[in-house]
């Protein structure tokens, strides 16, 4: 199965359907202006409602002090009981609100691990190591090269040391070494940036889909940083590329019931023991696009931390399609059919369609939480017209999420996925730039890719106070998850450069770079 062709065929079918009938541009222009006016009307509805109150206040200004005193005495005389009851009710409701409201979750800072330059894996290096293992057939080597050339990956992604060696040495000790290098590197950086003492961390959530040793990765961190004995430690495995946001959501839920706490979230993936050494094409795509990386995020529910935090967590939305057999099996770790029974992750033909359904469900849930009222009314009106009144001539209205968010961090799972989301959400190249550049510079780093993308936006100086960022990722299960953040301050790239913990900061002037549709592998015999 040629996954690249599958994605291309899927995209071609989509383009064919979309271009089957040219749109009526006159109607499109009219709708555009109606929509814009509607947006301004709803957005300014508060001011329209306040206007009568202002007029009443202006009228009351003509009252004399004696008139106001008489009015007050009158109300006091005849409505003392009702006023007392109202005041008591107000105090009760205020107390109830402050005692039951959700705790605010702040992101103090985060750090992404940047491997040493000795671990850089060019496209030529990847093909050279794949050829040297002597397992892949010539056809499958050509298949991997074709995937790699169209993947959108650049020449500076990273591979673990064990797989760059000749011959490679994928073993448990090397896998542990990779995990420790990535996790500890990211954690050291975030602790240095925030100045938080490891003993103050009360919650630890680690996610890594394919590498789950005993003791666990979370236990490694507890041991390394000597975290306190009552730390709430969680290790999430097998949850795919969307597990990073699942970890954020879990930490959020725990912080609601653990007052004055810090939560450390660590997201990574392990390549050493998960390089597929077989000839099942459905499993070879993962070899070509997954690369080394990880991130550490420090959250807090302490009100005093707001002034030094970067972001506030506004929403998390989780979607799970696992009840459907096709969705459950579309990303599946199994043994291949060869005699050696090599283990790999198989990607099915309908992966893109299933991802699209999960994405649709997730954004449909998220939309009412974040979209302006004008967008919600337009969406609801077209939905009623189509479903209730059966007016099929009206096209489904796609809300403009650019009105809800300034920045988009879309999981860098592959070029075809990014192309589809860009088209379906009508995003610009500027909005897609963090995701595309992350895929180019670091490859698919699984659940941590969202943080490399946010770090890119910070290094570019794009994050301003009040900006809203949408992180969205999808992965095995099949799951699609979202997180919405609001910037609490403007991020100054010069300060990030002084800390030297942003993986982009020393080379951000080189980006964005052009990413051609095909990047030929110039040689398959490179040695290092």
Swiss-Prot record:
Disruption phenotype: No visible phenotype in flowers or siliques, but reduced root growth. Suberin with a significant decrease in VLCFA derivatives longer than C20. No visible phenotype, but reduced root growth. Kcs2 and kcs20 double mutants have a glossy green appearance due to a significant reduction of the amount of epicuticular wax crystals on the stems and siliques, a significant reduction of C22 and C24 VLCFA derivatives in aliphatic suberin and a roots growth retardation and abnormal lamellation of the suberin layer in the endodermis. Pathway: Lipid metabolism; fatty acid biosynthesis. Coiled coil: none annotated. Its EC number is 2.3.1.199. Keywords: Acyltransferase, Membrane, Transferase, Transmembrane, Transmembrane helix. One of its GO terms (biological process) is suberin biosynthetic process. Signal peptide: none annotated. The keyword rRNA-binding does not apply. One of its GO terms (cellular component) is membrane. Induction: Repressed by herbicides such as flufenacet and benfuresate. Up-regulated by wounding, drought and salt. Strongly up-regulated by abscisic acid and drought, and to a lower level, by salt and osmotic stress. Up-regulated by the MYB94 transcription factor. InterPro entries: 3-ktacl-CoA_syn, ACP_syn_III_C, FAE1_typ3_polyketide_synth, Thiolase-like. PANTHER family: 3-KETOACYL-COA SYNTHASE. Belongs to the thiolase-like superfamily. Chalcone/stilbene synthases family. This is 3-ketoacyl-CoA synthase 2. It comes from Arabidopsis thaliana (Mouse-ear cress). The lineage of its organism: Eukaryota, Viridiplantae, Streptophyta, Embryophyta, Tracheophyta.
């Amino acid at each position: 199965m040629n996954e690249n062709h599958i994605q291309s065929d899927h995209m071609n079918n989509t383009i064919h359907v979309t271009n089957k009938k040219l749109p009526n541009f006159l109607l499109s222009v009219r709708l555009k202006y109606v929509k814009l006016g509607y947006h301004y009307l709803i957005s300014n509805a508060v001011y329209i409602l306040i206007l009568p109150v202002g007029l009443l206040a202006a009228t009351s200004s003509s009252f004399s002090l004696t008139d106001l005193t008489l009015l007050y005495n009158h109300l006091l005389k005849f409505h003392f009981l009702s006023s007392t009851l109202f005041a008591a009710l107000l105090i009760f409701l205020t107390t109830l609100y402050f005692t039951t409201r959700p705790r605010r979750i702040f992101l103090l800072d985060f750090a992404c691990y940047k491997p040493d330059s000795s671990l850089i894996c060019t496209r030529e290096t990847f093909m050279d190591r794949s050829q040297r293992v002597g397992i892949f057939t010539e056809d499958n080597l050509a298949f991997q090269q074709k995937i790699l050339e169209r993947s959108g990956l650049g020449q500076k992604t990273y591979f673990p040391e064990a797989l760059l060696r000749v011959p490679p040495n994928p073993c448990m000790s090397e896998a542990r070494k990779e995990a420790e290098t990535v996790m500890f590197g990211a954690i050291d950086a975030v602790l240095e940036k925030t100045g938080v003492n490891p003993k103050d961390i009360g919650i630890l959530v680690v996610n890594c889909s394919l590498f789950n040793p005993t003791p666990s990765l979370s236990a490694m961190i507890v041991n390394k940083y000597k975290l306190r004995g009552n730390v709430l430690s969680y290790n999430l495995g097998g949850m795919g590329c969307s597990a990073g946001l699942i970890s954020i959501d879990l930490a959020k839920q725990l912080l609601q019931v653990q007052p004055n706490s810090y939560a450390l979230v660590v997201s990574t993936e392990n390549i050493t023991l998960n390089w597929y050494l077989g000839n099942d094409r459905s499993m070879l795509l993962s070899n070509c696009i997954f690369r080394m990386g990880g991130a550490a995020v420090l959250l807090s529910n302490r009100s005093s931390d707001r002034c030094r935090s970067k972001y506030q967590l506004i929403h998390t939305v989780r979607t799970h399609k696992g009840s459907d057999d096709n969705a459950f099996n579309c990303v599946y770790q199994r043994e291949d059919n060869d005699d050696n029974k090599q283990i790999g992750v198989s990607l099915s033909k309908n992966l893109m369609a299933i991802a699209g359904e999960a994405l649709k469900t997730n954004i449909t849930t998220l939309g009412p939480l974040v979209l302006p009222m004008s967008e919600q009314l337009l969406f609801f009106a077209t939905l009623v017209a189509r479903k209730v009144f059966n007016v099929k001539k009206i096209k489904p209205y796609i809300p403009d999420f650019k009105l809800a968010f300034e920045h988009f961090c879309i999981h860098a799972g592959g070029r075809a996925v990014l192309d589809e989301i860009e088209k379906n959400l009508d995003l610009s190249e500027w909005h897609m730039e963090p995701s595309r550049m992350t895929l180019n510079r670091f490859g698919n780093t699984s659940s941590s890719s969202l943080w490399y993308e946010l770090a890119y936006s910070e290094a570019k100086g794009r994050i301003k106070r009040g900006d809203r960022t949408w992180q969205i990722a999808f992965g095995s299960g099949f799951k699609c998850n979202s997180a919405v953040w609001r910037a609490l301050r403007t991020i100054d790239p010069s300060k990030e450069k002084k800390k030297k913990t942003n993986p982009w900061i020393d080379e951000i002037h080189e980006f964005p770079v052009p990413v051609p549709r095909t990047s030929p592998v110039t040689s398959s015999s490179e040695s290092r």
